[in-house]
Regions:
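Short glycine-rich or small-residue beta-strand-to-loop segments that form or flank ligand, phosphate
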Residues: 4-8
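Conserved PLP-enzyme active-site core in the AAT-like
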Residues: 10-180
């Protein structure tokens, strides 16, 4: 429905922080359902170090669910959701883990199963390194918001900075307000 594509979004991590901080408030919970995210995301979430302005400092709690046989364990994800859970986070790439990247087929299956029980929960896909490798993108299979870096696939390693956020218009409007 809408997107922000900006060189002023310094990186993929910056785009992810903007997204999470725009959608999550004190008392909310985020669950990473594709295992441990990048180290930089752990800093953003307040799980590594104590950088000022991290989400834990803002009262956002965090849980993570490991992959099961290199796939999203959607059954465990559904069981872990509480009244506080506002957003489920999926990291498509391997990050620093030794595992295959998540395919859109696997992500779609998880989103469909989760939406059967929790139709209104936000689902965010960290799409860094995932752009342009399949005919569709995560927003085509039910993700509310897709986030990535312009430095990696879109920028071909040539762009020095930049990030993007694409998804539902009301979400992008909230993120744009946070950015400007």
């Amino acid at each position: 429905e809408d997107a922000l594509v900006r060189p002023s979004i310094a990186s993929g991590t910056h785009a992810l922080y903007l997204t999470l901080s725009a959608l999550l408030n004190h008392g909310d919970e985020v669950i990473a359902i594709s295992g441990r995210p990048y180290d930089t995301m752990l800093t953003v979430l307040g799980q590594d170090g104590n950088e000022p302005g991290n989400l834990k400092e803002s009262g956002v709690t965090y849980k993570e669910i490991s992959l099961y046989n290199n796939d999203i364990d959607w059954e465990s994800a559904i069981k872990e959701v509480t009244m506080k859970t506002k957003l489920l986070m999926i990291q498509r790439s391997t990050g620093y883990s030794f595992r295959p990247a998540l395919t859109l087929a696997k992500i779609k299956n998880a989103i469909e199963k989760i939406r059967e029980i929790y139709p209104n929960i936000y689902i965010m896909v960290d799409n860094c390194y995932g752009e342009f490798i399949e005919e569709i993108e995560p927003s085509d299979i039910g993700a509310d918001v897709v986030v990535g870096s312009l430095i990696k696939n879109p920028g071909g390693g040539i762009a020095l900075s930049g990030g993007y956020v694409a998804g539902k218009k009301f979400i992008i409007d909230r993120i744009a307000n946070r950015l400007t």
